[in-house]
């Protein structure tokens, strides 16, 4: 076995008909976790339906259909491997909750593959003001996906004919846009591919001798392995708190950043309760330390179940402990709201595991969704489709962190049984409260 392979999560973005499914399907098909039997079954079904040539996208469509019907789908189907890395495709747009998923941290991507339709008319539609190419790229950058690969697809199309001039034209225009968003185009590989025929996907294409760069798989293998946030201070949002006979109080949650070890002194926010951790368990086994991504239960001393609850955040008392937020500034996109939203609007905010009403205290500026430029200072109202910077005030004590410090914590606002807005927290004003320190914690000081 030797060294373990690096795990990288990818999101595949791009305009509706850019060929994301075919391209993704092709990678999974060629390097992936789908067994031959499943592929043969899909191929047979595809040819029976007269979709023989559509087999790569068909693979993905089958997976999506199973996912939509909530059949818990074997996640191996969304994986593919190279010599160096294991890639998991965590979401592909077209899935209706894509934007929401990207934001609320159900999917923290390490890198994005932006698929572009290079055909005449197709490219222009995707990059136009209403196209999704720009929006997806901006969203990826805003949400902290700092590595990008651009796959200029459909180079086999009769309007493109593997043309170097078309490649240069697209590269120039998309680079300009990515630069505006915040990416450094020098570091973004542009790869002319055919997701359908496989040109430059895994092997260099014989149809494009003029292109001397990496194949798509080569570029994926060149991605920087993600730094897992175990070196950041501990943040562990609580999902539940149990009282277990003979053991005591056991909060449960997923470590988002940092590490948790038995013997640590933790502070819970927003109530500032400080105590010692007796033991940490995952799947009924004791751990010497829990790292980001681990779902753990931990036993705390001298704390009653009434003292802490879901939505609280555990942190290390000696290393930038979490605090209650007095208010915070968020950049939000209004997704669906029937009317106008003004100052004073108070939807329920979901961030990590907490679920608390937050007031739009001041809508500070309305911004352009695609460029991030200010359009209007202190607008009276914002409506569906608008992006804005808003000062928000929690209506009950809550703990949130800025997105740059603790990326897994994006926010979504709900009202009328739907997601009204999604966004990221830019900065937080924290309250300096004093809270109860248990005897166990005092002894450890």
UniProtKB/Swiss-Prot annotation:
Q: Which residues carry this modification: N6-methyllysine?
A: 261
**Residue segments, region G2:** 70-74
Extract the coiled-coil ranges from the record.
Answer: none
Which residues are reported to carry the modification N6,N6-dimethyllysine?
A: 55
Q: Which residues carry this modification: N6,N6,N6-trimethyllysine?
A: 79, 187, 306, 396
Positions of the region G1?
Answer: 14-21
Where in this protein does the record put region G4? 153-156
Q: Which GO terms describe its cellular component?
A: cytoplasm
Which GO MF terms are attached to this record?
Answer: GTP binding; GTPase activity; translation elongation factor activity
Segments traversing the membrane: none
Q: Where is this region: G3?
A: 91-94
The chain positions of domain tr-type G read 5-230
The alphabetized UniProt keywords are:
Cytoplasm, Elongation factor, GTP-binding, Methylation, Nucleotide-binding, Protein biosynthesis
In residue numbers, the region (G5) covers 194-196
Question: What residues does GTP bind to?
Answer: 14-21, 91-95, 153-156
Subcellular location(s): the record lists: Cytoplasm
- Give the protein family: Belongs to the TRAFAC class translation factor GTPase superfamily. Classic translation factor GTPase family. EF-Tu/EF-1A subfamily.
Question: Tell me, what does this protein do in biology?
Answer: This protein promotes the GTP-dependent binding of aminoacyl-tRNA to the A-site of ribosomes during protein biosynthesis.
Alphabetized NCBIfam families for the sequence? EF-1_alpha, PRK12317.1
Against PANTHER family, the record matches this protein to:
TRANSLATION FACTOR
UniProt-recorded name of the protein: Elongation factor 1-alpha
């Amino acid at each position: 076995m030797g060294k373990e392979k690096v795990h990288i999560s990818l999101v595949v973005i791009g305009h509706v008909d850019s060929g994301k499914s075919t391209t993704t399907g092709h990678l999974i098909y060629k390097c992936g976790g789908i067994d031959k039997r499943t592929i043969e079954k899909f191929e047979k079904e595809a040819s029976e339906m007269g979709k023989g040539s559509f087999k790569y996208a068909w693979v993905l469509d089958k997976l999506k259909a199973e996912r939509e019907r909530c059949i818990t789908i074997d996640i191996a189907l969304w994986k593919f491997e190279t010599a160096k890395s294991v890639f998991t495709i965590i979401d592909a747009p077209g899935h209706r909750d894509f934007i929401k998923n990207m934001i609320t941290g159900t999917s923290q991507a390490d890198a994005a593959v932006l698929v572009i339709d290079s055909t005449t008319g197709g490219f222009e539609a995707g990059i136009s003001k209403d196209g999704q190419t720009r929006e997806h790229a901006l969203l990826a950058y805003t949400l902290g996906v700092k590595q990008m690969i651009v796959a200029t697809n459909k180079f086999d199309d009769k309007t493109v004919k593997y043309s170097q001039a078309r490649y240069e034209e697209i590269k120039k225009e998309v680079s300009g846009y990515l630069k505006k968003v915040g990416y450094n185009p020098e570091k973004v590989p542009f790869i002319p591919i055919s997701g359908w025929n496989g040109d430059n996907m895994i092997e260099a294409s014989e149809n494009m001798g003029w292109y001397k760069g990496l194949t798509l798989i080569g570029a994926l293998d060149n991605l920087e392995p993600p730094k897992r946030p175990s070196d950041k201070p501990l943040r562990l949002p609580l999902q539940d708190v149990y009282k277990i006979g003979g053991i005591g109080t056991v909060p449960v949650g997923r470590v988002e950043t940092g590490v948790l070890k038995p013997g640590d002194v933790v502070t819970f926010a927003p109530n500032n309760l400080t105590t010692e951790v007796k033991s940490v368990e995952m799947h009924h086994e004791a751990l010497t330390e829990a790292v980001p991504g681990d779902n753990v239960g931990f036993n705390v001393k001298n704390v009653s179940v009434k003292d802490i609850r879901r939505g609280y955040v555990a942190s290390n008392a000696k290393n930038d402990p979490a605090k209650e937020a007095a208010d915070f500034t968020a950049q939000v996109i209004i997704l669906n709201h029937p009317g106008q939203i003004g100052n004073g609007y108070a939807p329920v905010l979901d961030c990590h595991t907490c679920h608390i009403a937050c007031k739009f205290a001041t809508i500070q500026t309305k911004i352009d969704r695609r460029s991030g430029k200010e359009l209007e200072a202190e607008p009276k109202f914002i409506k569906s489709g608008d992006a804005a910077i808003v000062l928000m005030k929690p209506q009950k004590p809550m703990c949130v962190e800025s997105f740059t410090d603790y990326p897994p914590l994006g926010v979504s606002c709900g009202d009328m049984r739907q997601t009204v807005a999604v966004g990221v927290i830019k900065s937080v004003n924290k309250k300096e409260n004093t809270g109860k320190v248990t005897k166990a914690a005092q002894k450890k000081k």
